[in-house]
């Protein structure tokens, strides 16, 4: 077996073991040290896979759909580990592991053999912009996907109850309101420092989701801008309304709407989580769906390994 494919399957096996273990630890409310170890080992295996493919091909391993899926799985597991450093809980693994698992499964079992092999770069990708643009876009997708999955976890753990989350996300200014009794017996609002407040599980999930999506949105913005500059150098136009470009813009607008609703503090709880969840579908169309169409400047990923 090709060692590149073998490393991918090894990472798949580790994540496949980590996922049910994470759900079991969530239900039993136990710590997630073993789950984190499995995910970290899977990330190391994916790192070795990408380095080996880079050595085999002689170029940055993100030139076809197989390589980009493996890179996305690596970025998702790394993002997941970074999020768990802020809040070491199996809920994060239970919510985010399916994304990395799905990426590896699709790359290893769904793609034709010829697309799993290393191949020369197509002419459009023979540029120094490859690493800057494509890798930043893929890392932004990873952050947005993990953040959106955490929003899905908010909706699932909410179990249909109305939420009014006031977490330490951007827009709260480091404070949240708490109802306090006044000397006259009335109930008034007072600003309470976040460091003195014990957050609920949903508040922590909401805050982590928001922060992760914010990072992903900023990276997506950088990726789109760098892609426009690259397009101008390659084809003489910053924007051509290629299907991938159009859906990248739609993706940017969806998450811009999510951040706007949070920053304005007009929406809290379930509604912004629903917007973030919709972003999962938009990224899926932008990343995979457009490639299946086989049209446009970005269609090389599926049909032309």
From Swiss-Prot:
GO terms for biological process: cytochrome complex assembly. Its main location: membrane. The chain crosses the membrane at residues 4-24, 32-52, 58-78, 91-111, 136-156, 212-232, 246-263, 275-295. One of its GO terms (cellular component) is plasma membrane-derived thylakoid membrane. Keywords: Cytochrome c-type biogenesis, Membrane, Thylakoid, Transmembrane, Transmembrane helix. It is a multi-pass membrane protein. GO terms for molecular function: heme binding. Pfam families: Cytochrom_C_asm. The keyword Thylakoid applies. It is found in: Cellular thylakoid membrane. HAMAP family: CytC_CcsA (MF_01391). Belongs to the CcmF/CycK/Ccl1/NrfE/CcsA family. May interact with ccs1. Required during biogenesis of c-type cytochromes (cytochrome c6 and cytochrome f) at the step of heme attachment. PANTHER family: CYTOCHROME B_B6 PROTEIN-RELATED, HEME EXPORTER PROTEIN C. This is Cytochrome c biogenesis protein CcsA. It comes from Synechococcus sp. (strain CC9311).
């Amino acid at each position: 077996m090709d060692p590149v494919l073998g490393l991918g399957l090894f990472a798949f096996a580790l994540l496949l073991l980590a996922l049910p273990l994470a759900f079991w630890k969530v239900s039993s409310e136990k710590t997630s040290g073993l789950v984190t170890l499995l995910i970290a080992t899977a990330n190391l295996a994916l790192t070795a896979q990408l380095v080996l493919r880079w050595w085999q091909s002689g170029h940055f391993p993100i030139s076809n759909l197989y390589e980009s899926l493996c890179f996305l799985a690596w970025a998702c597991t790394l993002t997941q580990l970074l999020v768990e450093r802020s809040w070491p809980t199996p809920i994060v693994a239970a919510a985010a592991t399916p994304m990395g698992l799905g990426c590896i499964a699709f790359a290893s079992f769904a793609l034709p053999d010829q697309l799993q092999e290393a191949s020369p770069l197509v002419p459009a990708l023979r540029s120094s912009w490859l690493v800057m643009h494509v890798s930043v876009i893929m890392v932004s997708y990873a952050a947005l996907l993990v953040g959106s999955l955490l929003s899905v976890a908010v909706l699932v753990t909410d179990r249909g109850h109305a939420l009014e989350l006031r977490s330490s996300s951007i827009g709260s200014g480091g404070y949240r309101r708490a109802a306090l009794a006044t000397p006259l017996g009335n109930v008034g609002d007072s600003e309470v420092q976040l460091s003195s407040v014990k957050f609920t599980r949903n508040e922590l999930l909401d805050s982590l989701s928001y922060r992760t999506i914010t990072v992903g949105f900023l990276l997506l913005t950088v990726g789109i801008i760098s892609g426009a500059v690259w397009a101008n150098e390659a084809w003489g136009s910053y924007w051509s309304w290629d299907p991938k470009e159009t859906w990248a813009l739609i993706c940017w607008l969806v998450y811009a709407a999510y951040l706007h609703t949070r920053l304005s503090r007009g929406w809290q709880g379930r509604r912004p989580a629903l917007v973030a969840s919709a972003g999962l579908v938009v990224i899926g169309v932008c990343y995979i769906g457009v490639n299946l169409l086989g049209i446009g400047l970005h269609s090389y990923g599926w049909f032309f390994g």
